[in-house]
């Protein structure tokens, strides 16, 4: 039970003076528990539903849409299902950018070519994040490809202890990206979801003993960058005049756990926010998890 309560915030890794990689230890423990312990029926059912719904965007979208019709009856459900229903969004965000596999740079030669991981949950619940990422990248001369075949990074099944399913997803993603890297070239694989980025960056470690995939996995992990990391290292961002507010705002920034502890990225997003001309505030205990 105490393993299930771990949120994988990785704060323990930042705090540990010996540099113990607890993320890998917890993942190993979850896999061991999944293989050796028989959970109660309801627990098994919920975990199976999560494993088969969330990583598949079309199924997940259908479930989210249908959940609003089920919410009035949540009082009849077990506490676990009731909590999940309460957290489900009331509506799906509309897309504002026409979806396509390739987003070219207009009127100039691309300065870089990247693949954007559009994710499973994010492409359904918050598609505007991907759209904004594409707009900023192409505006600054970066050609962007999206690969809809890559539905999920595999982290959900990885954290559920379903190692075989997770590794299957890892390998499928690696094959798609590596083929694109060899055929057309990739300067980076961009993640704008820090949890996904942490997992993809760990592909090389997870598959280090796989003779068929270790080389490819290592390369994919090396190519993977958080979007703020890529901006900070490769682009001189030019904010449009209409994006600069005449009034300065005080913005409190809380870094995602998987970003600051999992990927050791903290200053880059703050530097980007400062370039907007606003005042960025550090919040007390910003290293602690929000609980999500």
Question: What are the residue ranges of the model-derived segments?
Answer:
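Iron-sulfur cluster-binding cysteine motifs and their immediate structural context
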Residues: 1, 5-32, 199
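Iron-sulfur cluster-binding electron-transfer modules in prokaryotic oxidoreductases
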Residues: 23-292
